[in-house]
Structures are given as structure tokens and as C-alpha cells.
Amino acid sequence: MSDKILCDYCIKEITQNNYLAHVQKFHEENFLEIMKHIIQMNNDGYTTDEIAKKFNINESSVFKKLKDLSKNSNDIKEPLRISKWEPHDFKLEATTVWSFPDRGDWATHNGTYRGNWSPYIPRNIILRYSNEDDLVLDQFVGSGTTLVETKLLKRKGIGVDINPKAIEIAKNNVRFKKNNEYDPLIICGDARKLDFIDNNEVDLVCTHPPYANIIKYSDGIKGDLSLLDIDEFLEEIKNVAKEAIRVLKKGKYCVILIGDTRRHKHIIPLGFRVMDMFLEAGFVLKETIIKEQHNCKSTGFWYKRSIENNFLLIAHEYLFVFRKQ
């Protein structure tokens, strides 16, 4: 049951659920002033819960009003509805097999961006291989999962992606007010050409490259590695690895997630081929982690196909932890 509060303008007792509607109906000028402040706080990165507490009104009312307004105005950003800032009962992984059936729903994390990795992965990597105030680079930032974690964990973050749409999504996902002093730098650019980063400047590289010709992230953007065939992809990954080792400090770590693919019923060991590219660039391999996949189609159509055509469904990826000597 919604709590009752006194209207600031007519002293009438109103439920929190109906407060905004009441002010809009009976105190229009005051309503417009309240909405002006609510919109400003929303655009500044405050969550709907923080806004609701500020004005002592119902959170659902704030969310609904901002959601409706943002649909009709480019000047009003999507409301941030965040129920928690960290995972429940989190513990660092301690073995070389990682499994996260729960995708993770803290902060702005969600699984709507195709191919993004579980936030448990960068959280583990960042906590294990960096310290507060360190500089963390994601060369394929996508929807910004890594940078949400750098901001939450008080690291300085840099994210790069060649797709302007991804950049827009990433910027929206990190715009929350919490730890604002750790707002990351997000740049539309090429993972193979990080000219704006000096040699030996980065403390940790933490990234999830696209897979060759699996999920296409654009309709033909020049330099989009997801559009390449396997041989072309591997050739360009060499340049990604060279840039990673150039910008990384000595003794620091570069961690990438990559998986295999299948062509004509046979496995192509893309993961190990990518690993070789990073070793050739000068890295040494510290850890090989098997990351179990939970979004593979193990029932229905694909299960039937795997039996009929005698192949196994790929249900793992590789998390390679490299070190710069």
C-alpha cells in the first residue's frame, strides 16, 4: 500500500503513487517546476530511485513519467532504473573453469546487446589484475559492460569501438552519477590504431573481441572485424595484439575472451589461433580459463541438428590471461 504524504501546495493528503498526477491536475505551474528538476536530475545521471527519494514521491511514477517523456524528446535521456550496485554474495573465481548461469543485473547491466559478456567476467578480471585508480582499456567496448565495472570499482576506463551505435549505448550505460569521478573515456575508433594512448600507459587490457563472421555488428563499417572471414580476422587480430602490448605497462596483464567456431561440421580453433597472435606479439600466457556458455541452444532445433549431423554444440569459450614481460 502506498504511503500518504501531504501536498506541498494545498496540504491535501495524497498517496505517493498519485502525488505527481495530483500536482499536475491541481497545481500545473508547480508541476512544471518539479518536472524541470526531475528531468535535469535524470539527464545528470541520477537513478529514478534517487530522484524519487529527493522529492519524496513514488519511484514508479518517476520512471513512467520519464519513460514517456524520453520517447518523445531527444533532450530527455532514458531513465536509469537501478535496484542494486553490485552482485549479491560475490566471490572471486579461484579455478580455471568459470560458469555464470546468472547474467548479472546490477547497475545498468543487461543481456540485450548481442554478444556482450557477463559482467562477472570483467569484475573478476579487474579485481584480480588491477588496483583502484589504475587505467583499464577495452579495445572492443560494445555496450560498455567493462566500463560499467571500471566505474563501479573506481578504475579509470577507456573504451574503443568502431561502431558509433555501440558508442552511444556504452555512453548511456555508464552515465550514472555514482563514482562520477571515474567517468570513462569512450571513443569511436579502431582497436588497431590507438594513437591517442601513449606507450606503456595502460594498467590492464580487458576485452571481448568479436568472432570472425559470426555476429555482424554493423552493415559495412570499414574496419569492423566482425565482418571479416577467418583468415582476414586473424591477420587483423595481429594488429590488435600489437597495439595492446604497446600501450600496456610492463608486468601488467591483457585478458581477452574468445571462442571457437565451426565450418562444414568441423571445429575451427579460433580461440587458440587468436592466442597465438598475442604470443607472437610478445605476450606470455599466464592463465587459460574455460568459460562455460549458458546461452547455447541445447534443446529443440539445434539439439536435433547436432544428433542428426553428428556434431557437438560449442558450449565454452577461452579466457586468455596474458602478461607483458
Q: Across the structure, where does each feature detected by a protein language model lie?
A:
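Class I S-adenosyl-L-methionine-dependent methyltransferase catalytic core
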Residues: S2-E13, N17-Q325
